[in-house]
Amino acid sequence: MASVVGDDCNLDVMPPRKKKNKGSNKMQDKLNSNNNTGSKKSRKRKLNSNVNTVACKSQKRKLKKLEEDKEKEILFSKTAELLDKYKISEDVSSLLQSSKVIGRSATKLEKRRRAMQLSKAGVETEHSDESVEQNDNDDDSCMDEPTTPEHVEIETPTFVTDSEQQLVHADLMISAEESSSKLEVDDTVDMIPLTTCRDDDEDSMDGLIENEDVTVQGPRVPAFVVHVSRPAEVEETRKDLPIVMMEQEIMEAINRHPAVIISGQTGCGKTTQVPQFLYEAGFGSKQFSSRSGIIGITQPRRVAVLATAKRVAFELGVRLGKEVGFQVRYDKKIGENSSIKFMTDGILLREIQNDFLLRRYSVIILDEAHERSLNTDILIGMLTRVIKIRQEYYEEQQKSLQSGGTVTSECQITPLKLILMSATLRVEDFVSGKRLFPNIPPLIEVPTRQYPVTIHFSKKTEIVDYIGEAYKKVMSIHKKLPQGGILVFVTGQREVDYLCEKLRKSSKELVVQAAKRDAYVKKKCDDGSFGGVDMKEIAEAFDDDSNNQNSRFSSHGEDPSDIGDGNYDDDFEEEDMYESDEDRDWETVDDGFASSFVEEGKLDALRAAFNALADKNGSVSAEPAKSIAAENQEAEQVKNKFSPGKLRVLPLYAMLSPAAQLRVFEEVEKEERLVVVATNVAETSLTIPGIKYVVDTGRVKVKNYDSKTGMESYEVDWISQASASQRAGRAGRTGPGHCYRLYSSAVFSNIFEESSLPEIMKVPVDGVILLMKSMNIPKVENFPFPTPPEPSAIREAERCLKALEALDSNGGLTPLGKAMSHYPMSPRHSRMLLTVIQMLKETRNYSRANLILGYAVAAVAALSLPNPLIMEFEGEKKNESKDADKTVKQEDKQRKKDRKEKIKAARDRFSNPSSDALTVAYALHSFEVSENGMGFCEANGLHLKTMDEMSKLKDQLLRLVFNCCKPSETEDSFSWTHGTIQDVEKSWRITTSTSSKTPLLQNEEELLGEAICAGWADRVARKTRATEYQACAVQEPVFLHRWSSLINSAPELLVYSELLLTNRPYMHGATRVRPEWLVKHAKSLCVFSAPLKDPKPYYSSEEDRVLCWVVPSFGPHNWELPAHSVAITEDRDRAAAFGCALLQGEVLTCLKSFRALLAGKPETLLEREAWGLERVGSLVMVLTEKKIDTLESLRKNWEQNPNVLYSEIEVWFQKKFRHRVKDLWQTMLKEAHVRRS
């Protein structure tokens, strides 16, 4: 060390030496030469001190490492001694059996062999040969029949102290007291888990000491095991699943904690295996009371529910619909005694609304929690409270039982287990602030079985033409890299269709060029050249640069100029996709003859020629020359591996039909390469086999919602880092893969968010608020959401519900709001449906009521789903390159033109000038009555998938009308009384006549339009010019879409279901409304003027009340609507108006013939100045005191005293006619149907 730090030492600390580059490092030499003498001394002192410090730290690390090694050796030796001390003998170990035989019936030979082994070991057997022979018949029958789940009671893992150790194995039990010595446990080990299969030892375990650090729900009870007989192929497959190796760890965490979080990447097996772990542990078994509840598993998508339910049933060897069932929106298959139930999160949310404690369940698994769907977030918040409440109820019941009380089986409550499972779980959202869980649940991370995926970032990020860059990268992969499927992520259907069309065209051109080159090569071969290659051209190519030869025959056929300097340790390095114009232009083909050979893969003759030239020039190869046949065989292998063949390009997006989606799973021919162009639906929903390369554009189309204006917009935005990881993982499902990201690492690190926003932050929460209110949660802002919505969104939702009359002015739930909460749909749609039921209930004995209800349900389904009418030619700009128009062939243009004319004809066929919703409802009716639904959609330009889903939704809503709104559950005014569900379906199935395209009458269409107005009363627009409107919610003008059915009529007032911003704000789902509908169904949005004197107040015999006229102003823009009649609020004004109507004969018609006998005009009662007159003032005063302002109130007063108002009305007659009042009075009492006592 002294020699290193001596005074004469000029020490210089330098970084590690890099690889030698071309040229000298002039900058470093210049810096070294500029060092002066004065700085050397100070630097020397500084370096000396640094070296001493480094040496001291290094010695400490070495000493510390030596000490740690010694401690490990001591611990290892102690462990070995302890194991040797209690090692069982070989005679005893031979009696041990594998755990796989548990639950399997032994044969006669196996039982005798087992008895002989026990006898040799000196262990007495309980059963003799005779007992074995007696059970032979049973054993044989068990072998012939399929094995059913078997229940075996064992004790749960208990924890044993030093003084009570036991060694237990199946039929052989050796107590610690009989052992040669007593087990000594190290101080670092607190407990040892113990499992036994003997019922005789239960009493001996009661006194064992429990660990205080372990959270246990309730007292320790016997466990329950369900033995499963799986198919052989399932057992083989399960061995490769990482989560199977962690079964014990997972089940221990579930048994000890009320909530558990399991995190594992896609493919680890958590979705299918965790329910099986619980099933085998006794959950869902009716024979084990504390775990008899169903195992419930939620998925955010219906397709995942069906797939996982079928897979789990197959792996357990049971029938789907018996032990394992499922329930989705349109389908249900579950038995009464099912143990496992798969369902969507919306199904469980409806169940928790009816039974908050979820008494039917013992375990709830929320899968795909990282997606943060709206329903899943609500369920997490509710279930955390359910866990606590059920635990408290359980403890109370246990105390009651210990004190001698009794609890019926129906009222028995057991603890509930909650399991959150996710691929990329943001744990901080669930455990931060202890808002959800007072005690942080354990997090179990499951390793993945994913193959390694090499990530390639682009050096530059293309902002505009990223579709063009994706096309170039796909073609580059196809031409240069080995076989393997390519998955391309784009944003929407338009981009998918455009890129697919462009790739198919390029694939055809490659095939044509290959055919031409094959013909050219064949012609050269016929000329007698060496192996079909001109030796002169080969010699010139060889003499140009010998390095190019190595480049051409590199192991992967890539140009070295394309290799980047990224640090990647896989076979393929990061590629620079932007280096040369030659690489950017995929249409360019090399002119050189040898280049055409390389592109075609004709390497046999070319390599032989190069070998011959190399030998001629003295570059003798170390290996002997290969035969021509061997060279041809090797060249053929290279050709088959790297030659660019035909591309099989397939689209994949959500609106694609199921049959078209399944095409991506079909096998690809040997000479083809699969290319799937998909939206983000391929991130998690589907796993496409054979994908080796992923091209990620880094974009996604998101739907943004502005809670203040209610305007929605589709925008192309960057994906999150979590989504990027999901996309890259698609390349590593079947083998090592590569992901080419068309953006730089700087963009990924600095611009991409860590994860996407939860759905609750991006959608309206009016349905959430209504659900909370219906479950007696008045203050929604205090609910424990994992991510609470914005306060402004909550206020906007409450304003919307008040406009829909679901909430009163104080925020309380109205009877209408309670009925709306029973429907699993948006509050707007349920308001519309209930309005139809209310109005038809008021119209009694209407023969066509069932038909109107059928169309009402169809209109609700139409407004709930995207428009099924295909709009391919909206005029919106496609995201395509500049030469897109040049690439479209003339026949394609003509085909699109014909398609456009067909769609326009379909619009005219179904178009209803009053409502877009009724237009779609008519199309749905025609679709269902047609014999060929697929042909109908093809002929009329309709989306088959949307129409099919709309038909299913209509049927479900119709069942809800008859099941949800029963008189015992809701107000009787919301129940259907005009017929049964069969009557509605029969009326709906009628076919329209040729003279009319719709069976509905005009008044019936107006009734449905009024119901739509009730559901969207706060989304009103008023016409300003042509198709331009002013909406209530926004200041800027909005427009009717040119595909709307109302585009030609353009009514003065309309409501819309959606305001979508593209190049301008367009209204979708528009319906014409009348001004009186707004006042009737949206009074909270109206401001009324003072009662008008002209027209004067009047009495309505239909409503039996007096009304006055006012001028309403609607919405924030104060639109003045036509005069509207409302009830009079002032008591004296109301009494005076009723008295005027009574004298005019409007209340009792018998007075009309006596109007000429009156001494004054009845209208004077309406003038406050005339109330000073005796006959006017006395009548108004009595009417006010007696609260007589309706015919009903007048009748009740006359039944008590028939002479009420007699004197006050008599003075209104002229004196010479007052003698006729007595007879008139008897007629008035008779007409009022006064029942005299």
Swiss-Prot record:
It is an enzyme of class 3 (hydrolase). A motif (DEAH box) lies at residues 367-370. Residues 251-443 form the Helicase ATP-binding domain. The keyword ATP-binding applies. InterPro entries: DEAD-box_helicase_OB_fold, DEAD/DEAH_box_helicase_dom, DHX37-like_C, DNA/RNA_helicase_DEAH_CS, HA2_WH, Helicase-assoc_dom, Helicase_ATP-bd, Helicase_C-like. Residues 131-143, 567-585 have a biased composition (Acidic residues). Signal peptide: none annotated. It catalyses: ATP + H2O = ADP + phosphate + H(+). Belongs to the DEAD box helicase family. DEAH subfamily. Overexpression results in the development of a fasciated stem. This is ATP-dependent RNA helicase DEAH13. The lineage of its organism: Eukaryota, Viridiplantae, Streptophyta, Embryophyta, Tracheophyta. The gene is FAS4.
